[in-house]
């Protein structure tokens, strides 16, 4: 099927094919309200290298299920408060290198960059889910409860980090920005929706959006391949199709 299957005017008014669950807002309110001060504990390790303008740190904290999550933190050396960028990486990757991230300090910003659990960086994914782990994280945990879904955990990892950075001595809490590309854009949007202290959000080509539309257009390939794989192996007659997309709707960023 063509990727351009509706007129431009219709696209301009299009709001997505995903049906937002009736309890979507209540579900995510419960999730973030379950975060306690214990969840916001972290360990900050200063790196040996530095320069006159910047200080470099590694951040470790526990995700919602106890998995150890890793992030890089760079801030200007001056002893005052600065705007801070919360940067998220694209799918299968990891946080950018120290040199790359140092560019934020050059314009007077701090930056924190998280490694998504179980992908290309240092964050831990402790697993323990029911169902397939093949062909991508979109379907990871789909056969279990909502709390088992991989991206529910990643979204909460990102939210916890957004709360942690508010505690940093050099954070100007009135100037917190979330940013990302692809998967990172999805996380940037989700944390901006869940944490009202984030006052700016910048996205590039977001992933994890409008799963039903992706399926209807036969674009369930590459990062979305898990959807096709799941139906071929576990529901070839599509008996559970409605249920599957209803569950995916809880992590579909079109609903945030």
Language model features with spans:
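A short loop-to-beta-strand scaffold at the N-terminal edge of the catalytic core in hydrolase folds
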Residues: 55-60, 64-76
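Aromatic pocket-lining residues of Rossmann-like dinucleotide-binding sites
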Residues: 104, 165, 191-192
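Short beta-strand element of the alpha/beta-hydrolase
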Residues: 71, 75, 81-91
